[in-house]
């Protein structure tokens, strides 16, 4: 459903942000 898509996008966003923070 729409909520699952939102959850997936949020998870991916957190992963990307965490990756950027780790690169600093």
Swiss-Prot record:
Signal peptide location: none
Expressed in which tissues: Expressed by the skin glands.
Source organism, top-level taxon: Eukaryota
One GO-annotated biological process of the protein: defense response to Gram-negative bacterium
Cellular compartment(s): Secreted
Cellular component annotations (GO), alphabetically ordered: extracellular region
Chief localisation class: secreted
Keywords in alphabetical order: Amphibian defense peptide, Antibiotic, Antimicrobial, Secreted
Family listed: Belongs to the ascaphin family.
Functional description taken from the UniProt entry: Antimicrobial peptide that shows higher potency against Gram-negative bacteria than against Gram-positive bacteria. Has a very week hemolytic activity.
UniProt-recorded name of the protein: Ascaphin-2
Organism: Ascaphus truei (Coastal tailed frog)
């Amino acid at each position: 459903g729409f909520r699952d898509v939102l959850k997936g996008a949020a998870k991916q966003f957190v992963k990307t942000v965490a990756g950027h923070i780790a690169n600093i």
